[in-house]
Curated annotation (Swiss-Prot):
Species this protein is from: Petrotoga mobilis (strain DSM 10674 / SJ95)
Protein name: Protein translocase subunit SecD
GO cellular component labels: plasma membrane
Subunit structure comment from the entry: Forms a complex with SecF. Part of the essential Sec protein translocation apparatus which comprises SecA, SecYEG and auxiliary proteins SecDF. Other proteins may also be involved.
Keyword Calcium: no
GO molecular function ontology, one term from the record: protein-transporting ATPase activity
Record keywords, A-Z: Cell inner membrane, Cell membrane, Membrane, Protein transport, Translocation, Transmembrane, Transmembrane helix, Transport
Amino acid sequence: MRNRRIRILFTVIVFVFALLGLILPLSGNVNDISILRFFPNINLGLDIQGGVLLEYSFDVPEGVNTSEVVDNVITVLRRRMDNAGYTEAIVSEVVSGGESRVRVEIPGISDTQRAEELIGSKGKLYFAEVLEVVESTTTPEITRNRTIQINGEEIEMYSYVKDSNNPNLWYRVKNVFEFGDAPFQITGLDVTDAVASLNSQGAGFVVNLNFSNEGRQKFELATANLVNERIAIILDDEVIIAPVVRERISQGRAEISGIESMEEAQNIAVLIKSGNLPVDLVKYQERTLGPTLGRDIVTTIINAGIIGLIIVMIYMIIFYRWMGVIADIALIYNTFLLMGILSWTGAILTLPGIAGIILTFGTTVDGNIIIYERIKEELRIGRPPLTAVKFGFNKVFSTIFDANITTILAGLVLFFVTSGSIRGFAVTLIIGVLGAMFTNLVVSRLLLESTSHFLKPEKYVKGIVVEKGGTK
């Protein structure tokens, strides 16, 4: 009795957990495609709702671990997508022909310009002392230069950097500040936050920077020694702004002004907050996918799946009577469980993923048929309904378990060796089969044991009926 209560409680908790994943506002998605409109928390892939796919290649410096570079690139790009509001974007590694590339999939957008600006920019921010400004149609040459080592990195003391708005305007800058006890740099690592806003002092937009404690001390030291001189704020080897220092700045804040649009200001803020890319990215491919084709296909697939599901449910009731009703309840339970887990985990639902869901319907029904045929055999030899149910489940447990585990292993292989939409199929297959195994072995058993008195053993008994301890 105690075990049965535990199973009831566990079954209810799992169902409530899945249901909460479907009804709680976990995301801001608005799915308006067929029945998916009732599951707004499920993230849809590019092949369903359309979007942009961008893929980038890169060169790894000799002696540097490729895996570490890939992980760093993915981490930085993931932060950039989140900070830019593309929270549903997928950033992943793609390996082809022994070459690693990074793929970024952004559902629901059609304009690639901003995405390319965010992804393709290296995001390297630093401050430098301006020594002179020259005009030239080509890159000026540094006649005398030297390097200095800071934190194990060799840095050129001087360089020419072009203006972001005027390609013929060049700043000769000193990349290292030589004030205080030791030379130092002020980089994006010293910035804790960057916020885009309207310029309250004049036209245009600004990006407000907040420094860390160490960054504040560096910036205060630099500005104290450069009063009436210019400091350049450089992003991706372009001078964004080079203001004149009027006084020592000790508040730990700086401002990038002169930005023409809010979008540009937001992009700069995102790049600064997200950190530097360890390598330069080169665009390998770009695809823009419209949502119309995906929606039409999804609607067709879902409608076909619903029709097939109804036919299967009717079939189960006709051939298995009350056990068929239990099978249908288990099927609905598994559907909610699968959708709930997809919502909670944030997994991306793709067209192959929908095919995986439909496949799990068959897995759930197939498992129930195996169990019910075994129960019918137990009823035929005269076992009472409740005993027949218990014997039936006990005897097919290993069969159901082994069959589902085999399918799950195949799904795991697909998940780890593939990418994109095929991985989406693997995800829904694994979740669906796990749900099918749970509903077959726990939910269906609980319901059948609780309602075994609805079974009609006389429909299955043939010949001599065997009772406990003798014959009749």
